UniProtKB/Swiss-Prot annotation:
It holds the Pfam family tRNA-synt_1_2. It catalyses: tRNA(Leu) + L-leucine + ATP = L-leucyl-tRNA(Leu) + AMP + diphosphate. This is Leucine--tRNA ligase. It comes from the Bacteria. It comes from Bacillus cereus (strain B4264).
Amino acid sequence: MSFNHQEIEKKWQGYWEENKTFRTPDETEKPKFYALDMFPYPSGAGLHVGHPEGYTATDILSRMKRMQGYNVLHPMGWDAFGLPAEQYALDTGNSPAEFTEHNINTFRNQIKSLGFSYDWDREVNTTDPNYYKWTQWIFLKLFEKGLAYVDEVPVNWCPALGTVLANEEIIDGKSERGGHPVERRPMRQWMLKITAYGDRLLEDLDELDWPESLKDMQRNWIGRSEGAEVHFNIDGTDEKFTVFTTRPDTLFGATYCVLAPEHALVAEITTAEQKEAVEAYINAVKMKSDLERTELAKEKTGVFTGAYAVNPVNGEKLPIWIADYVLATYGTGAVMAVPAHDERDYEFASVFNLPMKEVVKGGDITKEVYTGDGAHVNSAFLDGLNKEEAIAKMIEWLEATSAGNQKVTYRLRDWLFSRQRYWGEPIPVIHWEDGTMTAVKEEELPLVLPKTENIRPSGTGESPLANIDEWVNVVDPETGKKGRRETNTMPQWAGSCWYYLRYIDPNNSEALVDPEKVKQWLPVDIYIGGAEHAVLHLLYARFWHKVLYDIGVVPTKEPFQQLFNQGMILGENNEKMSKSKGNVVNPDDIVASHGADTLRLYEMFMGPLDASIAWSENGLDGARRFLDRVWRLFVQDNGELSEKITDAPNKELEKAYHQTVKKVTEDYAELRFNTAISQMMVFINDAYKAETLPREYVEGFVKMIAPVAPHIGEELWSKLGYNETITYASWPTFDESKLVEDEVEIVVQVMGKVRAKLTMSKDASKEEMEQLALEAIQDQIEGKTVRKVVVVPGKLVNVVAN
């Protein structure tokens, strides 16, 4: 007989809710464990089977840690601002707040149906004014520290959506959402000075228990490089521009310069003959995203401006070009080109037939670029020096002649923080008619997002908030000065930068988080989520955390001690699940047909947690069959406990049980859930063969399966006679001495070739091993003379016979 999952799951979910089984007390003598999930964006589509994979992993850890005597913080909430809700509101005329609330309720019910042990009293929602009051408070702190500033920035403007898009929201020059054309235009934007924290964001990665591949992604994104700035005068004018280079030693090899098409000097220096070509090129570039412009594989394009720069080191005149591979937002927006010794410059020079000049020996620049080290040539005072010596000497020369200076730059850009949308946190700043701006006073927070029927983009580049006169227009009560509120809102990243802190103290109206509580819970012990957030979300959260550390709000330098990215669950055809492909699996259907415990077990058993694996109905059925086998082993058809369960010990199961406790405990801790489940399957097979089942082993097994399949775990626990939940029962322990193998497998070789394998006592003497081995290979050595027998105790016997 199999168990009735619908009945059991409903029963125990009701019990947990009623008894607040997973409430986390703040005051406790127990050691702490903080297990964090990347909270979801509550979309209209609801939960998909990819969500529970990470959630089940943290839930297994949380449930085991509670049984091991830890005070566990395991919360859930909603990252609920953002573009999709606003787009839905635009498409349907409904309010994004109602849409969001409806979606959250759906998500919450779906998540509860999967039996996760969240403390729902700590639920947070980024769109709740009591929450975003503190998001705004953090913004005020950034503003006070000079880390939030306004700048004119070329942005990705999408006329159809009426908003600015991040590079990540653009695919092939069109918006990811809706496929609308995108163009570049300068706009007044709020920026956060994340570059001020570049070194710390880089250095502190070393202290974290994160996958090395993920640390490398962050290192590359920050992209620290050391080099020099060099100033170039423009021939025949008073103008100059600055380039950053990691190879100042190759300055003698510069043969042309390239400016970004958006560079401020372009219009000024372009000659009349080149004006038309330059303007046409600039218009074409406006349609491209930064990502497309800097792709290594693409064909190089560019236009000559007609102007020349003067090389400070030798007075040579270098033609100035514009090209889209140089970005105004990266470095200084200008480069000196040394085609003999730089890949991209070489490609560009080859396309436009520009001169090349060798200044480092070691290659043949008539055939290909040479980027290696070597003795410098054609470089006056650098001749004969290697790369490092030449860099140091050139920087010395640049600084002595005021032609440049040593410089460290980052690939990391300051964070474009404003969005021209309605559905986001209002930025708490007022712009006054006299040109000044002030922050909203702390005591006036939260600055609440006004309700409005019309959330269409204003079309001017401002957000829909610009249309709400009574909200936008303000008067200073003291001076009578008129002002306008900031109409930009914060990006969706803002609320997710610090949510892990609010879980610690979710209802505090006086402070972001209580200092004692935050000291108790930080850092987060494990953070599990998808790899798509490996760079931006984690970088932004680390940045805000460091600012909060500097102002004394948090006691740790880093927020997340250990981090793990789960893999992706693909459709049965090995493709990414998507509505358009019709291969999405809805967890609600599985919970109805197979049960939440089966879904949890299957997702953990599919393969390693970090692998991407295809969904399989057969695998799902197999997971259910295993749970049915467990049930039938312990429970009779009449619902009573199996008569095989006794208080007497059973020697034949002893080793298998202790092995299982050891392996499951270690594998859960190391997130190797698939191999832990395999071991439990082995134990169940052994238990079916056994005459009797010691009660101690049955209870231990139920405790081990409960974190994966908590409903069946609770039901079996109550059948074992316990009135209390299994949640806080103590985790089983194993005895090392019971794991020792009494017997070993010995390999028997003849002339170095394996001819037999024997099982014998691990303490067998050399003589016994030799005797047993010779008996086993009698037919192999018949008629031969045994010349020598080599015995390696506990391992092998090699017979030399001919």
